Design a protein with these regions (language model features):
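Mobile cap/lid helix-loop segments that gate and shape the active-site cleft of serine hydrolases
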Residues: 1-35
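Conserved serine/cysteine hydrolase catalytic core
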Residues: 30-41, 58-59
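Short beta-strand/loop motif that positions the catalytic acidic residue
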Residues: 39-40, 45-48, 52
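Conserved alpha/beta-hydrolase "acid-adjacent" motif
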Residues: 53-62
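Catalytic histidine neighborhood in serine/cysteine hydrolases
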Residues: 68-85
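Catalytic histidine-centered segment of alpha/beta-hydrolase-like enzymes
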Residues: 82-95
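Catalytic active-site module of serine/aspartate enzymes centered on a nucleophile-bearing elbow/loop
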Residues: 92-117
């Protein structure tokens, strides 16, 4: 995505983080599921900015569908008016994202409590 858009700063960060470059595939969650590796499928919350041009929404939609197809529980929330890293900037959508996390955690705790009872 960074190369396609000519985002030199993101390309530099990717080159630094994924060194050697082929390591980008080793730990890529989508590719792990595509390879049908054995993994623990914990409940997952994905929050995506609808205007994010770093990790585009379609990538998260595909991953959520793949995760569900592999037997995992995945809640995907797309915040239509948000870009990348919007949760760190005070706004109504950031507040909603924080509430979404709280609700997701509360749901997981209720599920664990029911199993323990």
């Amino acid at each position: 995505q960074a190369e396609r858009k000519g985002n030199k700063e993101m390309m530099k960060k990717s080159d630094t983080f994924f060194n050697p470059p082929e390591t980008i595939h080793e730990g890529n969650p989508q590719e792990i599921l595509d390879r049908k590796e054995k993994v623990v499928m914990l409940p997952m919350l994905i929050m995506q900015g609808g205007l994010d041009d770093n990790v585009i929404p379609e990538i998260q939609e595909k991953f959520a569908a793949t995760y569900r197809a592999a037997g995992g529980e995945c809640q995907l929330e797309i915040f239509k008016n948000s870009e990348h890293e919007w949760t760190a900037v005070p706004s109504a959508e950031a507040d909603l994202s924080h509430e979404t996390v709280k609700q997701f955690i509360a749901k997981q705790l209720r599920t664990l409590q029911k199993k323990a009872a």
